[in-house]
Amino acid sequence: RQGIGSAMLSWAEERIRQLVKQHGTARTAVIGANAMSSEQDATALLLAADYRRVFSLVELKLGDLQQLPELGSELPAGIRTGPIGTSHYRAAWRTVVDSYADTSFTQKWTFQDFVDTADPACWRAAWNEQDMVGVALCSIRRHQHTVGEVEELSVRTDQRRLGIGRVLLLDGLRSLREQGATTARLFTGTANPHRSYDLYESVGFRRQNEYVRYRKPLAWSTGHLTVRSVHRI
């Protein structure tokens, strides 16, 4: 085993340099790699090769959807919740996009992408009169029908810390349970300024894995490139 990971990483980096030389156009080339925090050998390999941690995602699991807590708090006056229909799609998409406006490491998500992957059976929203102020977008895993996913939980900036997120999350989890899910999972960034962990843990989620993203610059530049899944070596 010793030396195989280093050899594979060196080969992958050299291959990327060749591709950049042939096709690259940018001036700030970087190589990216992934490793779980529990994979100590892969992490040590990347750090020794001058990769630096840039961000990470944590996987959380709720083991039993039959054991959901009671709401524990009421919604603010004027706020109501309900399912998301097709006529609400654009407002739901905009609510999510706007909630990420001040964050880094987010991919562009067009409205057409939203529509193409829409699966609203377990989607819930909150409104203040006619204005949508938050969404919980949950779904059943396609090939694991007993596992639910919390794909997005977003509340508009001016409506946070009012208990709306917790109510939406519990509504979404109950919808998953009604659709046959027995457990639920979600991913969230560790550099989250809104203390989302406290909310997720308050309804029963527990940390499972942390997936760390590493990057390092190339010696010369032409684009953003990625070595994927180094932890599988």
Segments the model singles out, each with a brief description of its role:
Residues 169, 192-196, 213-218:
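Short glycine/proline-centered loop/turn elements that form peptide/ligand docking sites
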Residues 42, 46, 200, 205:
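Conserved active-site tyrosine of GNAT-family acetyltransferases
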Residues 1-76, 210-216:
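Acyl-donor-binding surface of acyltransferase catalytic domains
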Residues 2-18, 155, 161-178, 183, ...:
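Conserved acetyl-CoA-binding loop-helix of GNAT-fold acetyltransferases
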Residues 80-92, 233:
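A short beta-loop-alpha structural element at the N-terminal edge
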Residues 101-155:
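A conserved beta-strand-loop-helix scaffold within acyl/acetyltransferase catalytic domains
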Residues 31-33, 150, 184-188:
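Conserved hydrophobic beta-strand within the GNAT/NAT acetyltransferase core sheet
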